[in-house]
Amino acid sequence: MVTIETRADQMVLNLGPHHPSTHGVLRLIVTLDGENVVDCRPVLGYLHRGMEKIGENRTIIQYLPYCSRWDYAAAMMNEAPVVNAPEAMAGVKVPRRASYIRVIMLELSRIANHLLWVGPFLLDMGAQSPFFYILRERELILDLFEAATGLRMVGNNYFRVGGVTVDLPYGWVDKAHDLCDVIPGKIDEYERLITNNPIFRRRIENLGYISREDAINWGLSGPMLRASGVKWDLRKVDHYEIYDELDWDIAWDTGGDCLARYIVRIKEMRESVKIIRQALDQLPGGPYEQLEARRLAEGPKSEWNSFDYQFIGKKSSPTFKIPTGEYYARSEEAKGELGIYVVGRDDTTPWRWKIRTPDFANLAILPMILQGTKVADLVVVLGSIDIIMGSVDR
């Protein structure tokens, strides 16, 4: 009698570090049993540039251009905690107009990030059309960034200790209002095309499940945490900038799978549009052209020249010293909690500069949620986390 022997050896597969589906220079050492993933070990560091050590050898002004090289999909969001930490340590006050401008820029960056997530996420599953649609809308946001800061994607260098670099230019507020009229309709278009598509839903429902307890225990943040049923948003928790003065809701879901993470990001884009609309309407002094007209009409002693109507309180000098002490500043970035831990020594440079990026923490759970999935689903689960390797490796 002839017997057929089958080999049951496990196979080790190297994915990356330059595979397009890894969204950067990420290497995954995947152990497979047939088509099932048994183990996955991320290998990091291919894009490590020593951002923390650079921060310890630069003044705040010198270091700000480096920040946009962390998460370059939402570059301006990296600047917020970098200036918030010295402001809190030195007791620097920020004018209300500057705070409103910051919030507008942060929420525009959030929408730009989520648009750039939706397109490649669908592309990982073989759907090419949405990728071209999101570039169309993202272009409108990048045009606004270019008008206000001079640059589109990275190196905006717009936030400053005490405010922002320059005021919003002539006609910018009207263009931002036009954008807020366009984006909701485009999100509706995405939802008609994607959300209830039966092929899309069968592909990602119940895939990459993370329970509420696991999300908390692994220290997840952002859409990864809120998609597992945890209503935690630093904009509500920490009450920073002027978010408390605006009416908006936390985007969350209880599914815990890849579909829930997609739904949360779609909801977040809608909430960001609500925030931007209100911030534009309530902007102290109104559009730049109206504010300047009031100042000219009422003279140098006009109330429109008071502190709250400035784009920066007091320009920090190149020799601005970080006071002795330590502080942890954090903000709700598009991917989660971005934190900066600073130890000052009454010097122009910090003694310790620690960066806590959200996608580095969120990536840690990948090996756990991949166990038992098919190898074909690996890139989909990875894509649902939303990582940028410049931010992960720093």
UniProtKB/Swiss-Prot annotation:
Source taxon at top rank: Bacteria
One Pfam family this sequence matches: Complex1_49kDa
Keyword GTP-binding on entry: no
Name of the protein this chain belongs to: NAD(P)H-quinone oxidoreductase subunit H 2
Enzyme Commission number(s) of this protein: 7.1.1.-
Single GO biological process annotation from the record: photosynthesis, light reaction
Sample GO molecular function, one term: oxidoreductase activity, acting on NAD(P)H, quinone or similar compound as acceptor
Catalysed reactions, as listed in the record: a plastoquinone + NADH + (n+1) H(+)(in) = a plastoquinol + NAD(+) + n H(+)(out); a plastoquinone + NADPH + (n+1) H(+)(in) = a plastoquinol + NADP(+) + n H(+)(out)
Function: NDH-1 shuttles electrons from an unknown electron donor, via FMN and iron-sulfur (Fe-S) centers, to quinones in the respiratory and/or the photosynthetic chain. The immediate electron acceptor for the enzyme in this species is believed to be plastoquinone. Couples the redox reaction to proton translocation, and thus conserves the redox energy in a proton gradient. Cyanobacterial NDH-1 also plays a role in inorganic carbon-concentration.
